[in-house]
Amino acid sequence: MRIGHGFDVHAFGGEGPIIIGGVRIPYDKGLLAHSDGDVALHALTDALLGAAALGDIGKLFPDTDPAFKGADSRELLREAWRRIQAKGYTLGNVDVTIIAQAPKMLPHIPQMRVFIAEDLGCHMDDVNVKATTTEKLGFTGRGEGIACEAVALLIKAAK
């Protein structure tokens, strides 16, 4: 078994909506990013890549490459997952923590879990997504952006 950890953060800027966990969430602000700015899927992709020792999302999909401008993070997650499976890994489980003062994530979490399970080809019982605030402390608490942490457990397939 191998464990990976991922982290991502994006500042608010421009107009909404925002995309988190593949879900389009109405909000008056957008997130500044080269791709679609999906902090949840970016952190999750990093966790999975880290567990498989395949680097990180920036190495695989660099923000200096115009091909990834406005990229759909679900596509990036699926491509990373294909590479991980090619190394002989299966999924144990993933756990994602979204850190945001606003907008509220709770109503959107069930659909986030559905999308992640679809993209990883796993059961929803293998996917947990939760959200928290920082009690108005720090940049997320001041409403300057959104952060996310994720962990992933991979299992080497039997030979």
UniProtKB/Swiss-Prot annotation:
Binds 1 divalent metal cation per subunit. Homotrimer. One of its GO terms (biological process) is isopentenyl diphosphate biosynthetic process, methylerythritol 4-phosphate pathway. A divalent metal cation binds at residues 8, 10, 42. One of its GO terms (molecular function) is 2-C-methyl-D-erythritol 2,4-cyclodiphosphate synthase activity. The keyword Metal-binding applies. The lineage of its organism: Bacteria, Pseudomonadati, Pseudomonadota, Gammaproteobacteria, Enterobacterales. This is 2-C-methyl-D-erythritol 2,4-cyclodiphosphate synthase. Belongs to the IspF family. Its EC number is 4.6.1.12. It is an enzyme of class 4 (lyase). It holds the Pfam family YgbB. It comes from Citrobacter koseri (strain ATCC BAA-895 / CDC 4225-83 / SGSC4696). Pathway: Isoprenoid biosynthesis; isopentenyl diphosphate biosynthesis via DXP pathway; isopentenyl diphosphate from 1-deoxy-D-xylulose 5-phosphate: step 4/6. 4-CDP-2-C-methyl-D-erythritol 2-phosphate binds at residues 8-10, 34-35, 56-58, 61-65, 100-106, 132-135, 139, 142. InterPro entries: MECDP_synthase, MECDP_synthase_CS, MECDP_synthase_sf. Involved in the biosynthesis of isopentenyl diphosphate (IPP) and dimethylallyl diphosphate (DMAPP), two major building blocks of isoprenoid compounds. Catalyzes the conversion of 4-diphosphocytidyl-2-C-methyl-D-erythritol 2-phosphate (CDP-ME2P) to 2-C-methyl-D-erythritol 2,4-cyclodiphosphate (ME-CPP) with a corresponding release of cytidine 5-monophosphate (CMP). Keywords: Isoprene biosynthesis, Lyase, Metal-binding. The gene is ispF. The keyword 4Fe-4S does not apply. The record marks 34, 133 as: Transition state stabilizer. It catalyses: 4-CDP-2-C-methyl-D-erythritol 2-phosphate = 2-C-methyl-D-erythritol 2,4-cyclic diphosphate + CMP. Its cofactor is a divalent metal cation. Coiled coil: none annotated.
